[in-house]
Amino acid sequence: MKRLPILLILGMLGFVSCSRPAQESLKPRIVVMTDIGPAEVEPDDNESAVRLMAYADRFEIEGIITTIGWNCDPYPEEWAVYLERVIDAYEVDVQNLMKRSGQKGFRTPEMENATQELGYWPSADYIRGRTVMGSRRAGIGVIGPDNDSPGSELLIRLADEDDDRPIWLCSWGGANTFAQAVWRVQQERTEAELKRFLRKFRLYTITDQDMVWAMRMNRAYSSHQWLRRDFADDLLLVWDESAWLNQNELGKANWDKYERFIQGKGEMGKVYPKFLWGVEGDTPSFLNVMPNGLNDPDDPEQVGWGGCHRFGLSPDGETSAWTNWQQPLKDISNAYEHKFYPDEFNDFAARMQWADTGAGNLNPVVVLDGNTGIKPLEIDARPGETLTFDASRSYDPDGDSLTFDWWFQEFPGQALYPDIDQSSGAKVRVTVPGTPGAYHLVCEVHDDGPFRLPAYRRIIVKVP
């Protein structure tokens, strides 16, 4: 289905490649499971779908699966038309969005179904071809021989592909479709093969929505509990109970900005509905994977735009997951979610301006000690050592001026942090404490153009 030989002409994109792209230049792989529906029932999934399409150059969208959630059981098949409306709007706006990266056209279907590099905008037909129906009934009770779906079959095919990148499952509704795929593999393959299957995936759930709203506290009803209980050793599962709530509430508090900068901007802005319960509550599931240099999502303790999480007891009181519902982590994650909200909104608003007009601001590029990547830099240091970091070669594609802010991420139980000299300059000196540990320094950069766009780079200072 994917991963065709790369020794092909890339077609109309405007450049030619004759070898497999470097791993860091490839997009992260994601699959969305959404209970999208009418705006008067489920507006936030429509909103999150618009934002996802505005970032289609940052994610390899392997699938969008329509499925059950708090508002529906069974999932009405006709609701999938609301996802189609967003994709249709993207088909119009992508002609402007491609101007952000100088893209002149789309690759052939065969090449679009191979790997995609960061910056490539896929065609609407590519996304349509990966939009399928998943489980239409909720709960662990329906998992079994009669619950296979195009969505569960897609997940199995994706896991079987020759691709080392993990697949992030963004659960906007229930993850019942994935649970069915796990069950099917468990029935038909060896234990070792099941483990390999599970280790291909990372699951980020927006609370637990594998049931209707009235049953939301019945954790045992959900297939998520089965996944956490039986597969915790092999499946990275994030159960968020902070970022989605803040996304909802901060969006409501700032709705005037959505009316001004999001709604009506391009065709996608025209299908971005007014909130009902909250704004884009599902968006943190893919913001967590955003390849912007702030975090490595494979380490959920690293804070990103989707919050931060620590492995421990989940809200059901029985199973464990990467979560943030307990103190002190809940307050820490909450503070960072408030801190980053202006950045992630402004970034979105700037992209919607591109969708509308084909022009706009571009993000700065962090160059840290001569390195332009986005993966965290790891530095070994001695207790008491002074380290120097230089981001002075960072630049803005539009020629905007840059400001710098350096800070250490707060972790529960970490009492001492290195001292930073000149935390607002392009160069900093850091004095390492005598206490062993890993200290996470973030270089945060903003331009002074419209929407004051951000860029980040993380440095992990390891002290033995």
Predicted ranges, named:
Residues 460-464:
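Short beta-strand edge segments in extracellular beta-sheet folds
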Residues 446-452:
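Short, solvent-exposed loop/turn segments at the edges of extracellular beta-sandwich modules
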Residues 1-4:
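Positively charged n-region of N-terminal signal peptides that target proteins for export
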Residues 6-14:
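Bacterial N-terminal signal peptides
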Residues 452-459:
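Extracellular and select intracellular beta-sandwich modules with Ser/Thr-enriched
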Residues 419-424:
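Short beta-strand segments within Ig-like beta-sandwich modules, predominantly Fibronectin type-III
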Residues 20-388, 394-416, 427-429, 438:
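N-terminal acidic, glycine/proline-rich low-complexity segments
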